């Protein structure tokens, strides 16, 4: 689960501003530099979601769909645990987003508590997926309430489902994760969606939503792989087309590199991310040098005309 959750806004004039935050460790803090980089990526590059690597930490940020609040500048960020699955985090995002929108307030203390509860909810959800026993205990509590409310038929149905569905749910999630790790993305999607159906049967709607979102995300991976292959070829062509008379073409490298970084983040491909980040840094340096060369060329021309 994430180490921290941060709700912030980006003001067009003043930049990012933290609305609420909650950290599992007190010494964990999101720095102004990270928020500034998020602001640049969200606003200047118009990225809906993005990830940053800084000081051995991973930070994920995504724009919140807050039209119902008449706000178009709310963002939610997480500091990730080492080795944490980004696909799972993205799948949880929708649940957290909904809670924030439903309970949004100008009271900072209340919003901090809301983020704390959201993080606890994430932990509970992930524990349920790993331990069928926890789901069974939840079902028992729910059926007791149904019986107290006189809902005998519904209680019996839920009791019957609770006999084997939690184990079938856990087994299906395990299969889905194995398919995902082995890069069988279509099979993984099918298993995640099947697991979501099991979760709905026993009225675990948060788990169902999480698994459905994860299945849909994994289902996009084959297309992302095709896009990545196309971008790699496009990048190679741009570089091969650059010669001494067309140095300005270095500018064309940045956009496909940025997109390749985003795709690599989806696959948790840290080796490619490091290589692409280095390539971007060198390309940006080349762009600066070309700019300096053009300025020098212009000044040389002006001086020669005066001689």
For the regions a language model picked out, list residue spans one by one.
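Acidic, low-complexity cytosolic segments
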Residues: 2-3, 13-142, 148-151
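Extended hydrophobic
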Residues: 8-9
């Amino acid at each position: 689960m994430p180490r921290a959750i941060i709700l912030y806004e980006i003001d067009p004039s003043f930049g990012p501003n933290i609305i609420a935050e909650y950290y599992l460790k007190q010494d964990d803090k999101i720095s102004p530099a990270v928020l500034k980089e998020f602001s640049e990526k969200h606003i200047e590059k118009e990225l809906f979601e993005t990830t940053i690597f800084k000081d051995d930490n991973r930070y994920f940020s995504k724009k919140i769909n807050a039209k119902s609040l008449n706000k178009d500048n709310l963002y939610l960020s997480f500091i990730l645990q080492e080795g944490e699955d980004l696909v799972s985090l993205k799948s949880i995002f929708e649940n957290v987003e909904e809670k924030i929108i439903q309970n949004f307030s100008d009271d900072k203390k209340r919003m901090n508590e809301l983020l704390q509860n959201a993080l606890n909810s994430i932990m509970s959800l992930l524990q349920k997926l790993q331990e069928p026993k926890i789901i069974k205990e939840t079902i028992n509590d729910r059926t007791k309430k149904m019986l107290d409310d006189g809902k005998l038929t519904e209680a019996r149905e839920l009791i019957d489902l609770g006999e084997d569905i939690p184990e079938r749910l856990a087994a299906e999630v395990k299969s889905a994760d194995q398919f995902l790790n082995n890069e069988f993305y279509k099979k993984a999607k099918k298993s995640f969606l099947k697991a979501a159906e099991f979760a709905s049967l026993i009225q675990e709607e948060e788990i169902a939503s999480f698994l459905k979102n994860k299945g849909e995300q994994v289902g996009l991976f084959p297309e992302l792989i095709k896009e990545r292959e196309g971008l790699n070829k496009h990048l190679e062509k741009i570089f091969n087309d650059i010669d001494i008379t067309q140095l300005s073409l270095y500018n064309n490298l940045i956009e496909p590199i940025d997109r390749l970084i985003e795709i690599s983040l989806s696959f948790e491909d840290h080796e490619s991310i490091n290589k692409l980040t280095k390539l971007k840094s060198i390309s940006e340096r080349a762009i600066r040098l070309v700019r300096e060369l053009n300025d020098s060329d212009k000044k040389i021309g002006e001086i020669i005309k005066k001689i």
